[in-house]
Design a protein with these regions (language model features):
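Glycine-rich phosphate/adenosyl-contacting loop at the front of the ribokinase-like
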Residues: 1-57, 66-67
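Cofactor-binding loop segments of dinucleotide-utilizing enzymes, especially the Rossmann-like FAD-
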Residues: 5-9, 59-62, 84, 136, ...
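Short glycine-rich anion-binding loops that position phosphate/pyrophosphate groups of nucleotides
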Residues: 8-10, 98-100, 106-108, 136-139
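Conserved N-terminal subdomain of the carbohydrate kinase-like
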Residues: 23, 49-129
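Residues at secondary-structure transition points
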Residues: 31-38, 88, 109-113, 144, ...
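A general structural detector for well-ordered alpha-helical segments in enzyme core domains, enriched
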Residues: 43, 118-121, 145, 149
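Conserved beta-alpha-beta core of the PfkB/ribokinase-like small-molecule kinase fold
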Residues: 130-181
Length: 181
């Protein structure tokens, strides 16, 4: 099985304007959409389109987390998220008015116990599985979380794929991920 991990999933609220954005003024939208995502979730979506099953893992919180989960299920994606007791899954606002302006939410705080629950889910992975760690991490997680997860799986034959930048990517290289992006 392929497992994707999105540490900070989001609902992207995309607003389109037919004129330039005017700061400090009322701007009327000519269209809007909600897009469910986060890098790992996006990978699960592409895999589903290719007919390849996967399980999307990560953290969700509050009504926005429940809404995200229902939306992914409606798209035919299988999820096994850790449900946080506090906070809400983030909402990012994307304003498309010639140029794109983004307002990205911070997302919920992820307590140590919730990270431990995710680690326990990953403990069942075997050499027949692929783990894809994708995207940024929220500030409440340790900066070495990717490295810690790969260390935890080291020697078990799980093929690990990492789609990240800067230290998140560089620090996992000693664990020889199957693929990096």
């Amino acid at each position: 099985m392929i497992y994707t991990v999105t540490f900070n999933p989001a609902i992207d609220y995309v607003v389109r304007l037919d004129a330039p954005l005017e700061i400090g003024q009322v701007n009327r939208a000519c269209g809007e959409d909600c897009v469910l995502g986060g890098k790992g979730i996006n990978v699960s979506g592409v895999l589903a389109q290719l007919g390849c099953p996967s399980v999307a893992l990560g953290f969700v919180a509050g009504e926005t987390g429940a809404w995200l989960e229902r939306g992914l299920a409606a798209q035919g994606l299988h999820t096994d998220f850790v449900h946080l007791e506090n906070g809400m899954t983030r909402i990012n606002v994307k304003i498309k008015a010639g140029q794109e302006t983004e307002l990205n939410g911070a997302g919920p705080d992820i307590p140590d116990e919730a990270l431990h629950q995710l680690e326990e889910k990953l403990d069942g992975l075997t050499e027949n599985d692929v783990l894809i760690l994708a995207g940024s991490i929220p500030a409440s997680l340790p900066q070495d979380v990717y490295e810690r997860l790969l260390a935890r799986l080291d020697g078990r034959g799980v093929r690990c794929v990492v789609d990240a930048t800067r230290d998140l990517l560089v620090n996992v290289l000693p664990y020889h991920p199957f693929l990096i992006k």
